[in-house]
Amino acid sequence: MKTKLKPISFCGAFLMLAAIGANAQSYNWISSTEGDVWQQAKISLQSKPTGTVDLIVNENEKIVTFKAWGTTFNELDWDALGVLTRNEQDEILHNVFSPEGDLRITRGRISMGANDYARSWYSCDEVEGDFELRYFNINRDKQAIIPFIRAAQKYNPELTFWISPWSPPSWMKIHGDYPVLSSKYNNLSPQLDYLLYGNIGGKTDPDEMKLTGERNGKFPRQLATTDYMIQDPRYLQTYANSFCKFIDAYKEQGIPIDMVIYQNEAYSYTPYPGCAWTAEGTIRFNKEYLGPTLKRLHPEVKLYLGTFNTNRQDHVEKIIADKELQAYISGMAFQWEGREVLPSIRQQHPEWDYICSESECGWGSFDWKAGEHTFELMNHYLGNGCKEYTFWNFILTDNGESPWGWKQNALIRVDSKARTFTYTPEYYAVKHYAHYIGAGTEVIAYKPEGEDKKPVLVVRTPEGKWVVMVGNFQDTEQSLTLQIGKRYLNATLAPHSMHTFEMR
């Protein structure tokens, strides 16, 4: 059954710890626990702390100025939305995209060609040897992705977009197929799996797959030694040209693209559309082909490096150390395991912008624990200076299964048999942030989740309002004490709860 979003009265699950001073600054307190979401109360700052101070907010410091929340426009999301009535679709699109809605998303990610939540494999040009791109087209996009975007634009005409491919056209790859590795979900011959490591090791390691296995703290456990994109200049230039063709084609559809990333997750060796790249191949393509081509044909479009889903810092540093490449780069994009190296990379290159290019999508559980994880991810990425945060699927049917056999979570879950929908715990986790943090909001202070499982983020809106996002992901109550100026925010947080405190 659909979970309604109407505010309801505060029911006593959360306890204020100190008497409220008559002249104290008042805050709205929004809290959520499993089965009892979006409770509202009021709380005021105090003159004294009632516990150990968790975080001291220095209003003269700033981590980053936030820009945008985003989501990805995938075919399976459009199919899920299509299960519902027009009124239900309108409710969802309003809540997700409208400036007056719940999540207020202003940014869209588009896959250039198929990704793992496409209906099936496709690219914009599967005509082998078409180096002039005469047969390049976005016909498949016109079936679902573009109608999906237009439906969102109805609620926010100012949406902007960025692109990244999962795989080049199959004929541009060394084995002539869209996946990296064989599986029962594709037709690639297992005999070609050895290409990933060339003559090193002989066989692929099943634990390299994101879907399964232990990785001993490293992802990937073994880096690919082979570029799956053919490294011949003619192929590389044609591929760079295809990015510009895609930008042009979407512009004709009234969809502005202002940022490009050369590859999604070059370090996931996948049975679905993917492409492994070495550090040398990544540098070569971005520095010698994609960067110069964008600068010449689309100087208004920024080039970011990513999407980095590896925690191998030495590998990332090797790529970004290239001085000629740096001349083309405006920022970096991190997701999944890449979150681990974000803080140190940002410290090395404070001149670049940073984004979370994909929120982690779980395994189809759609449970409260998944909501807590997403809450912590937003704390981590914003607290470590990301200006944008992009979600993956925002709506899926049933168990969220991909055509390539794995399950993922979404912000909204559709029951395809009953033709009903539910706002999931992750939806509310996102609302605790996105409803209050918009463009121009300054991220001021941050405390990571840590052993106490109590992540805290403090921001200041363009109107000068303080907003605090905090979670308690322990099995017991925890106290919260923040120092803001000369006063204190004191509260008791219920077990496994999410909170937003907004200055009134």
Where are these regions (language model features)?
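Alpha-helical scaffolding within the catalytic cores
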Residues: 49-59, 147, 245, 288-289, ...
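N-terminal catalytic cores of secreted or lumenal carbohydrate-active enzymes
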Residues: 34-257
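Aromatic/acidic polysaccharide-binding cleft in carbohydrate-active enzymes
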Residues: 353-429, 445-448
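Conserved, mostly hydrophobic/aromatic
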Residues: 71, 104, 161, 260, ...
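Carbohydrate-binding surface patches
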Residues: 447-485, 492, 496
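Solvent-exposed loop/turn segments at secondary-structure junctions
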Residues: 74-79, 114-117, 167-171, 264-269, ...
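Bacterial Sec-dependent N-terminal signal peptides
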Residues: 1-26
